[in-house]
């Protein structure tokens, strides 16, 4: 029996003039523009399909916590009984506000008192692609995660954050006891060739990286509180950054912690796909086949014709979800 599961979705209206003006006031020359470029705040205008997908494919969800600076989509019905509007100021300590960092917004989610112990964190570009069961996310009230060790090979500036995670994880879990004591959670048919990563990891000490699934992430509220208790100084420093920084950590740290404390159940590799917006043909194929539970459509530097690509994807979603959800006016 799975306890109540809440969804949490974060959203920013990058076109809001009030938000943009406040952002400008706090912008500083940090020399790392790729971490805070405009594509991070560009609106694909697909968010209504996120709600349509939830209503159709996950009607069992307890509540949806909509995290916002203060703005709301014009079409959103804020009076829906399952929808909880939460402003940053409602749960993030005032010394961290205003914030323009998704890491700060996510690292403090455990402070939302009404949020259930089991919750699933979405960004607004991660869509439920087919029918979703509670057991796809939690089993025995534990989050289902990919327990695959994969070497971190830095290729972009954002990878500093993953390196920061490994510094913490190796400080606490250098011996990988969970791997040695619960091998059945690290070796299974569903991992295919990725089992080799875990096999090789037996022969060396320390953790050199994890294989990440860019999908909606199941979390335990208590894990956030535990890490804040153990690494409060570090997290406080991260949360004082107004913008994302190479010295940050993010909510993936909580997932890794759950793996190393054996507070998880294995997830399948086919749980989701991460596809750049520019690869619209692949997006169409994944939506049509419905083999993956989640689809992350990422607007990144590969998107050359933003308007055309978004319009193409919107037509696909409109065909799949033609009816308004009850979350829409």
Swiss-Prot record:
UniProt-listed InterPro entries: Stealth, Stealth_CR1, Stealth_CR2, Stealth_CR3
EC number(s) recorded for this UniProt protein: 2.7.-.-
UniProt keyword Transferase present: yes
Top enzyme category: transferase
UniProt keyword annotations, A-Z: Exopolysaccharide synthesis, Transferase
GO BP, sorted A to Z: polysaccharide biosynthetic process
Domain of life assignment: Bacteria
Pfam families reported for this sequence: Stealth_CR1, Stealth_CR2, Stealth_CR3
Keyword Transferase: yes
MF-aspect GO terms: transferase activity, transferring phosphorus-containing groups
Family in the record: Belongs to the stealth family.
General remark: Stealth proteins are part of a protein family that is conserved from bacteria to higher eukaryotes. Family members were first identified in microbes as proteins that help pathogens to elude the host innate immune system. Microbial stealth proteins are involved in the biosynthesis of exopolysaccharides. Stealth proteins are predicted to function as hexose-1-phosphoryltransferases.
PANTHER family referenced in this protein's UniProt entry, alphabetically: N-ACETYLGLUCOSAMINE-1-PHOSPHOTRANSFERASE SUBUNITS ALPHA_BETA, PTHR24045
Name of the protein: Capsular polysaccharide phosphotransferase WcwK
């Amino acid at each position: 029996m799975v306890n109540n599961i809440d969804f949490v979705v974060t959203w920013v209206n990058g076109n809001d003039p009030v938000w943009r003006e406040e952002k400008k006031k706090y912008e500083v020359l940090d020399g790392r523009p790729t971490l805070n470029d405009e594509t991070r705040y560009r609106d694909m205008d697909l968010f209504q399909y996120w709600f349509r997908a939830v209503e159709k494919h996950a009607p069992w969800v307890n509540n949806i916590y909509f995290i916002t600076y203060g703005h709301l989509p014009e079409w959103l019905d804020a009076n829906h009984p399952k929808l909880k509007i939460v402003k940053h100021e409602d749960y993030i300590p005032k010394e961290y506000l205003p914030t323009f960092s998704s890491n700060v917004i996510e690292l403090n989610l455990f402070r939302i008192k009404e949020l259930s112990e089991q919750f699933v964190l979405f960004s607004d570009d991660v869509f439920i692609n087919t029918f979703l069961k509670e057991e796809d996310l939690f089993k025995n009230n534990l989050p289902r995660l990919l327990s695959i060790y994969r070497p971190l090979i830095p290729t972009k500036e954002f990878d500093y954050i993953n390196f920061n995670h490994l510094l913490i994880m190796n400080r606490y879990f250098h011996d990988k006891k969970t791997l040695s004591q619960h091998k059945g959670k690290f070796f299974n048919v569903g991992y295919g060739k990725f089992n080799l990563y875990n096999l090789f990891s037996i022969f060396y000490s320390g953790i050199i990286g994890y294989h990440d699934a860019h999908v909606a992430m199941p979390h335990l509220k208590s894990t956030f509180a535990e890490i804040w208790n153990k690494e409060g100084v570090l997290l406080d420093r991260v949360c004082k950054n107004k913008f994302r920084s190479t010295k940050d950590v993010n909510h993936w740290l909580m997932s890794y912690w759950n793996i190393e404390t054996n507070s998880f159940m294995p997830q399948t590799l086919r749980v989701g796909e991460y596809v750049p917006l520019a690869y619209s043909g692949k997006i169409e194929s994944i939506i049509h086949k419905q083999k993956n539970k989640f689809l992350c459509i990422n607007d990144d530097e590969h998107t050359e014709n933003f308007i055309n690509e978004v319009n193409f994807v919107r037509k696909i979603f409109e065909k799949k979800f033609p009816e308004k959800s009850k979350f829409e006016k």
